[in-house]
Amino acid sequence: MRLHRAKVSKSVFTLSTLTASCLMAFNSYAAVDCSALAEWQSDTIYTGGDQVQYNGSAYQANYWTQNNDPEQFSGDYAQWKLLDACTTDGGDDNQAPNATLTSPSASDVLTTGDVVTLAASASDNDGTIARVDFLVDGVVVAQASSAPYSATWTAVAGTHQISAIAYDDKALASTASQVSVSVTDSTQPGNEAPTVDITLSASQVDVGDVVTLTANAADADGSVDKVDFYVAGSLVGTVASTPYTLDYTTTRSGRWLCLRARLITSARQRIRPRRRLTVAAGPWSVPVVLMVCIKPKGQCAVLYGVREDGREKMGADHPRRVIGYFTSWRAGDDDQTAYLVKDIPWEQLTHINYAFVSIGSDGKVNVGDVNDANNAAVGKEWDGVEIDPTLGFKGHFGALATYKQKYGVKTLISIGGWAETGGHFDNDGNRVADGGFYTMTTNADGSINQQGIETFADSAVEMMRKYRFDGLDIDLRISNIDGGTGNPDDTAFSESRRAYLMNSYHELMRVLREKLDVASAQDGVHYMLTIAAPSSAYLLRGMETMAVTQYLDYVNIMSYDLHGAWNDHVGHNAALYDTGKDSELAQWNVYGTAQYGGIGYLNTDWAFHYFRGSMPAGRINIGVPYYTRGWQGVTGGDNGLWGARLAKSKRVSNRYGEGEKNNCGYGATGLDNMWHDVNAAGDEMGAGSNPMWHAKNLEHGIWGSYLAVYGLDPTTAPLVGTYARNYDSVAIAPWLWNAEKKVFLSTEDKQSIDVKADYVIDKEIGGIMFWELAGDYNCYVLDANGQRTSIDSTEQACESGQGEYHMGNTMTKAIYDKFKAATPYGNTVATGAVPSETVDIAVSIGGFKVGDQNYPINPKVTFTNNTGVDIPGGTAFQFDIPVSAPDNAKDQSGGGLSVIASGHTRADNIGGLDGTMHRVAFSLPAWKTLPAGDTYELDMVYYLPISGPANYSVNINGVDYAFKFEQPDLPLADLSSGNGGGTGGGDTGGGTTEPGDVVEWVPGSTQVSDGTTVTYNGKCFVAQNSPGVWESPTQTNWFWEEVTCP
């Protein structure tokens, strides 16, 4: 972690009486006697508590540090803490400043909820005032860095000590100036509480309809001054006399818009009952997913499958999700290859995704000829598979609709997939490359295909309703601004549209969410929208900040296929953690490049933290594979792991695209590739792809009775050598190694599943998704004829040669058993306290570059001031970014953006990332006000992908405010009184910001120190790393950082 004296806003917390007294006792400070302190040495290791002197000041180490200059790396969360200036003779010529608290006074009459002005005068005879701290009961509640020194505090009942302490430019503190004030409880005995309730003329309306809000307000021992009406945290009207009635015209949609009345009486009491109103979606709205209806007396309504706490209802034994993909193509009549709806372990699942539905040539969802009696989706029937005859359709859809009613499991249609993102299969099984998602969402000129999206979305919702599904799962592979990341067969459609695909993807998801919410309101159910998302940083870098998460119920991370035969790096298919040994990352010097912070990004833990930047943990599900990936002819490595196998030709197939332009690997074939794809010529594509039940048979040396059906026989594909199981206890990943054949198969089994399930529980993650149900295994006892009979849960029959593995539910049951008694999943994005009020500041993120130009990642974050008042220069903003990126985020706009609280400080992420979020901060230039209605553009830079950011706040006049768009149900602050502003601002950083301080650069002549801002050829730059007189600035590099000119 590298911090440069960034300021951190401090939240109010409760201290014990002893602690508060101790704090107040140290109300003035003397310089430190440094005679016994050693000078700081750059090559010395210091640990927490060590004290040193440096450049006339005393510092104390906060934690382990080496080669971190105490002057540059001091602060609340940095390596060093500044103690004070040094004195070696017991004296100090610096005089303490003076502070006088001018407000409040002891005679003030204060009531709970009053906004109290804190004000002080301050002076320093031999220097300047750096800041004034305001304290309540010994706790700093606000700071002011310029005169007039003032802030506000919301009064709470009781007697409180209010104090002001001034600090001079040498960090010497004044004696505390303090006063004791009493705050009366507005509901104290002798003052009867007022009453108020809200009634609505309608509980469900359309956008544009008028709703009459009526407040029945009374005060038995006083009078009602007024009633304020709020909708979604915004004041919409005030009524000062009876009847307290307001006609409100709905302007936004959403389930459960919060309606609130604030009653203010002559005794200044305030009570705030709430009601909720459902407003059906309008053509432009962005509904909010999974909101909770809070009624008076704390009761909550339950609707659309949402619990009182906002979490999804899934049954008493399902606090976390267990989601399985059911594939359409295992629909034959042979028990050796078929996997039907009756085979699903229904009791152990919460959701089933049907894979796949495609996009037909007409732009609508497609499952083939629905009038064909052999259509697996809607026409076919199977012995032993129950289908309700009253449904009006058969096939997998009929069976899923029948069984889910018995078990309370939700079903979703998965649309897309690798082969059907850019095309579909016709009735003869031939792939038709007609553009699929690419042409449906994006026109040839890059514009959004609005009509195509409307047509598709309408057909998807219609299919969902007709066939009794609970939602849509979009499996788009892959809408991306990076090149070579999708199916190479789709290149003709994808490459020309690449720069525009994310815009179209956002619009597609927005329209789907809107149409699903309209259908939900009409049908009285909650229809879900989810996606299958990639997991590697290379792919996610091309998906900007994954802004589509705002429209989703949850995201399923495909945290598998992290290594495979698309390149020659022999590694784990689905590692949970990085080990610091990933050969692909090592080849690209990810571990050794400082900007990456040593973070390995080909693992589940990294992918989870990426999505955690924009979503609660409970709206994220990690993925696990019930299949293998593998190579043949592997050389080197630890039993093959991190070895290599280059393909016989540079391109043995085009199955996986260009990726990072690694060499193609030599994928395992034959017996080691039972679940293989074929290319256009019908040839087997080597990938080492097998269901886990076949891998378990290989592990135990069993020739499966099913192999002949898959075209394998012992004469042409003999069982050679031993498939020894290995386990990486750091990555949490098993694999099989056949030393004789040099075959490596990356696997998943119960041991790794158990650890991953524990990880989900510990991290408060929503659950686990797996591909696919038919890949799970059981051990079956074989009878005298070699037929599978009963299940042996001990697996002894398979270990002794008396059984074989086949399709089952061992891993699924392990997940269910772990989850059934788990705590509820996490349901908040924020990891800390949220401010109690909001301001209306909008945020948009854009300007991402295309392809390899998108490094470092450098978007423009635009803040729009919708507060109605000017925001003064120097105002400090903060927000969170996930620890998927290292703690070296910065900006190129002079805002001094830096990480002020790091969630992960280690030089690697071996065994997992430590925290959840980094807190970053920047300030408006001190000389530049942000006018009402205007924007500020933050030119942000970071080095690994993030989703979000999230948890925005702004500090105005010493008070932290959340942003309205993130916290719509919190009250909106009133900044119109002129109390707004700027006193809570932090370091502007990034060099000088006053126009007069900018130095004109003259090559060969100008000599500057680090931090100086210069102008050259019409651009401005901040010096760093001591540039010489001939190091003329032309772009951001080792010596210069380009910034916006003041």
UniProtKB/Swiss-Prot annotation:
Temperature and activity: Optimum temperature is 35-37 degrees Celsius.
Record's keyword terms, sorted: Carbohydrate metabolism, Chitin degradation, Glycosidase, Hydrolase, Periplasm, Polysaccharide degradation, Signal
SMART domains per UniProt: ChtBD3 (SM00495), Glyco_18 (SM00636)
Induction data: By (GlcNAc)2.
Biased composition (Gly residues): 978-993
Keyword Hydrolase: yes
Any one GO cellular component localisation term in the record: extracellular region
UniProt domain GH18: residue ranges: 320-801
Broad enzyme group: hydrolase
Cellular localization per UniProt: Periplasm
One term of GO molecular function: hydrolase activity, hydrolyzing O-glycosyl compounds
InterPro entries: CBM5/12 (IPR003610), CBM_sf_5/12 (IPR036573), Chi_C (IPR009470), Chitinase_II/V-like_cat (IPR011583), Chitinase_insertion_sf (IPR029070), Glyco_hydro18_cat (IPR001223), Glycoside_hydrolase_SF (IPR017853), Glycosyl_Hydrlase_18 (IPR050314)
GO biological process, one term: chitin catabolic process
Region feature (Disordered): 973-996
Top-level taxon of origin: Bacteria
UniProt note on regulation of activity: Inhibited by (GlcNAc)4, (GlcNAc)5, (GlcNAc)6, and PNP-(GlcNAc)3.
pH-dependence annotation: Optimum pH is 6.5-7.0.
Gene3D superfamilies assigned: 3.10.50.10, Carbohydrate-binding module superfamily 5/12, Glycosidases, Immunoglobulins
Segment forming the signal sequence: 1-30
EC nos: 3.2.1.202
Catalytic activity: Hydrolysis of chitodextrins, releasing N,N'-diacetylchitobiose and small amounts of N,N',N''-triacetylchitotriose
Physiological role: Hydrolyzes chitin oligosaccharides; (GlcNAc)4 to (GlcNAc)2 and (GlcNAc)5,6 to (GlcNAc)2 and (GlcNAc)3. Inactive towards chitin, glucosamine oligosaccharides, glycoproteins and glycopeptides containing (GlcNAc)2.
Record-stated family: Belongs to the glycosyl hydrolase 18 family.
Protein name in the entry: Chitodextrinase
